[in-house]
A protein has these predicted regions:
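Residues that flank catalytic or metal-binding motifs in active/ligand-binding sites
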Residues: 108-110, 121-123, 171, 185, ...
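N-terminal "mature-chain" segments and other terminal, solvent-exposed stretches
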Residues: 1-138
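Short beta-strand elements
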Residues: 199-209
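Short, hydrophobic beta-strand segments
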Residues: 169-181
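Short coil/turn motifs at beta-sheet boundaries
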Residues: 105-107, 168, 182
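Internal, hydrophobic beta-strand segments that form the core of beta-sheet-rich folds
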Residues: 126-130, 178-196
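Exoplasmic/lumenal beta-rich domain surfaces
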Residues: 132-172
Length: 209
């Protein structure tokens, strides 16, 4: 079900289409930029500091992304387009644009596949989703997201430096989407690294039928 890869790397989701994939298709970003949407791993916390218990021996988090720059992992260069609303992207492209929506059902299994390009020891993956009634005309902020992740998939080995060979990035993994969701939502997926202060951020636009 969850297939680990021997060498652990920087990376991006290649299936299904993320916001990064769409930006690459539109010629706004290169794959290498989507591979490096990394920011502090303690999100949704606001500040840098130790990774929460029981994994305090992991490298401490650098500052997590600021509101409005969450989906790009805090990047404010060309990768800021990942944070754009439909209106902002329409202005950027000089044509009408809506982020493409992946059709899903509440409670279904949502599978992702990664392509990794630089080695890291993996603590795990964290999934977050927008609140009911969130405003698509505003950039994603902490206030737009549910307060707690709807799923976390962490390796439990401690300390990481004694188990690095076991804590492998997963090329394929999956999550059960929350029940009770309807309509348009944004999902944030974080690949959390044990031996740096960062996580790698990926975002998906979903339409719950």
């Amino acid at each position: 079900m969850n297939k680990p890869q021997t060498q652990l790397r920087h990376g991006r989701v290649v299936t299904p289409a993320s916001r990064g994939s769409v930006a690459v298709e539109r010629g706004l970003l290169g794959n290498w930029q989507v591979n490096e949407m990394e920011g502090g791993k303690n999100f949704p916390a606001l500040t840098a500091g130790p990774f929460p218990a029981p994994y305090q021996t992991d490298d401490p988090s650098v500052a997590p992304p600021a509101d409005g720059y969450i989906l790009s992992g805090g990047k404010t260069d060309d990768r800021d387009c990942i944070n754009f609303t439909d209106e902002e992207m329409s202005k950027k492209l000089n044509t009408s644009f809506n982020w493409p929506l992946l059709n899903v059902e509440a409670g279904q299994v949502f599978k992702v596949e990664w392509d990794y390009t630089a080695a890291h020891v993996t603590r795990g993956y964290r999934w977050l989703i927008t609140k009911d009634g969130w405003d698509p005309k505003q950039r994603i902020s902490r206030a737009q997201l549910e307060a707690k992740p709807f799923f976390e998939d962490f390796y439990t080995q401690e300390p990481y430096y004694q188990h690095a060979d076991e804590m492998k990035a997963k090329v394929e993994h999956q999550v059960t989407l929350p029940k009770g969701k309807k309509g348009r939502h944004v999902v944030v997926l974080m690949w959390i690294v044990a031996n740096t202060g960062n996580a790698f951020y990926q975002a998906f636009d979903l339409d719950f039928k």
